[in-house]
């Protein structure tokens, strides 16, 4: 039987329909929307330090609370640039409701972020943490710490390497040395002609400095004035041009070396950015090392560094987050890269619980290491005689004590060297000694570090310590994962370490607001 075709019916559609009572923007936004969380949290924050950034006078300014809301919400929904936020304020009802229909342009938004917010960003972050504590999202007890690299806003093809600057400077100085010899030869020719020997010879004995080059240029100018022959004048003029060219190069390389400082190099676009190896182990890009800490997957501290090594940045990280946090954390849980003597000592001074692994932590737990009598950790130690005993019952006595200084941090460690009295005819020599045949077994002992390791081993071995150690991967790694994957923030949009620090703190605040939103929805579901 053929299907009967009926007339299609459509819902009413009239763009010109006038409403007697037009809906407000508030009615169009759902009760559990993220924008309402941002609005509520910022309304409860004390932004007095931010308001104090405004000197007063002149025309009226957009309210800083509104600008802060717009900026945080923009970062929460992956709108990071000033122009895109300004466009959203005209097109997106969430932005329009949050701003109260205010429409600051992109210059106002960028200026607020890069100047006024930059000066008080730590205070604003602290206010957000206080809100999280009041609402019992965090307690500031445990601090799960780790680092991650973020690409800088710089051209990857415009890297300046310090070693190249040093090499090029050395070559330029050699060329200057050759020019100095030519100047000495020109002076000797002048002396033969005029019989005056009042010009000091530079040549190889002269240090290539800006003052030395200026002095040579001055003498050449004098030669041009006094010389009667055209050939001498042309030669002097040519040498002046060459010297000035090499002088400019040396000054340029000096500036590059000074800018690089203790780094391997810098980026021309963002001079504070450092070349760092990305996670794929292939690309080397201008980047910053971001160290962060969290509790309950809420970011409770964040800092920016120009060094790729997390361990050497840890002391600076604690100093920076100390300003951001309303109270000091009780325990720090971190991966083995952080387990250095300097960092352990820092935790002890600050009276913070030590749950940081060290590089050999997992290998020590293996059966083959526990049962290996030839590793120095398994040698018996006699405290009274200050000696170690090897598997062949031979004593290792203290041979020397030395100081070792860390190249980058300057931290000094005390190392004790113990040596066996007699390893000749030892049946375990091949298994015990890794050095050349005939040398007695020596071991290096850092008593202070060993004490800190034992402390970490005991803390991590408890039921609570084991639970916290296992939670580290799901805590801070989840925060970085949310920022990089869900928020798609892998590259900074500002330049300079201070502005970059401001931006990553805004990102951390946006992450926390997103997390509050999810927790509120979860609580509503559990209450239903």
List where the protein language model places each region.
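Conserved catalytic-core motifs characterized by acidic clusters
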Residues: 99
């Amino acid at each position: 039987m053929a299907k009967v075709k009926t007339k299609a019916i459509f819902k009413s559609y009239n763009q010109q329909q006038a409403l007697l009572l037009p809906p407000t923007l508030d009615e169009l936004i759902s009760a559990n929307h993220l924008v309402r969380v941002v609005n509520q949290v910022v309304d409860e924050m004390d932004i007095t330090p931010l308001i104090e950034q405004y000197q007063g006078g002149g025309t009226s300014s957009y309210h800083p609370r509104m600008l802060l809301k717009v900026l945080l919400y923009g970062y929460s929904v992956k709108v990071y640039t000033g122009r895109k936020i300004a466009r959203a304020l005209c097109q997106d009802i969430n932005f329009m409701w949050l701003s109260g229909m205010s429409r600051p342009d992109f210059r106002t938004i960028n200026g607020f972020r890069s100047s006024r917010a930059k000066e008080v960003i730590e205070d604003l972050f602290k206010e957000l943490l206080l809100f999280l504590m009041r609402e019992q999202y965090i307690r500031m007890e445990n601090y799960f710490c780790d680092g991650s690299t973020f690409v800088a806003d710089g051209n990857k093809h415009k890297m300046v390497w310090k070693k190249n600057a040093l090499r090029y400077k050395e070559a330029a100085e050699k060329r200057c040395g050759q020019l100095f010899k030519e100047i000495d030869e020109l002076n000797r020719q002048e002396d033969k002609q005029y019989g005056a020997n009042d010009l000091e010879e530079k040549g190889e004995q002269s240090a290539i400095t800006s003052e030395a080059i200026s002095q040579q240029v001055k003498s050449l100018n004098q030669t041009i004035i006094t010389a009667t022959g055209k050939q001498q004048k042309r030669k002097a003029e040519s040498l002046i041009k060459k010297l000035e060219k090499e002088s400019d190069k040396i000054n340029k390389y000096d500036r590059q070396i000074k800018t690089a400082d203790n780094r391997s190099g810098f980026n021309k676009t963002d001079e504070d950015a450092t070349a760092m190896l990305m996670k794929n182990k292939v690309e080397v890009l201008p980047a910053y090392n971001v160290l962060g800490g969290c509790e309950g997957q809420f970011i409770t501290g964040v800092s920016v560094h120009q060094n790729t090594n997390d361990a050497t940045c840890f002391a600076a990280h604690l100093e920076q987050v100390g300003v951001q946090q309303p109270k000091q954390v009780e325990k720090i849980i971190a991966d083995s890269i952080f387990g250095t003597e300097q960092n352990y000592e820092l935790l002890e001074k600050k009276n913070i619980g030590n749950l940081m692994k060290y590089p050999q932590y997992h290998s020590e737990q293996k059966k083959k290491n526990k049962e290996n009598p030839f590793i120095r950790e398994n040698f018996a130690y006699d405290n009274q005689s200050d000696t170690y005993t090897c598997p062949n019952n031979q004593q290792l006595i203290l041979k020397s004590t030395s100081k070792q200084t860390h190249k980058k941090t300057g931290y000094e460690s005390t190392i004790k060297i113990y040596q066996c009295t007699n390893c000749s005819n030892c049946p375990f020599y091949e298994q015990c000694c890794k050095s050349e045949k005939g040398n007695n077994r020596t071991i290096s002992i850092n008593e202070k570090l060993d004490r800190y390791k034992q402390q970490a081993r005991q803390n991590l071995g408890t039921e609570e310590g084991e639970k916290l150690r296992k939670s580290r991967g799901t805590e801070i790694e989840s925060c970085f994962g949310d920022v990089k994957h869900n928020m798609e923030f892998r590259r900074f949009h500002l330049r300079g370490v201070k502005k970059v620090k401001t931006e990553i703190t805004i990102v951390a605040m946006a992450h926390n607001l997103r997390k509050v939103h999810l927790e509120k929805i979860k609580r509503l579901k559990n209450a239903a």
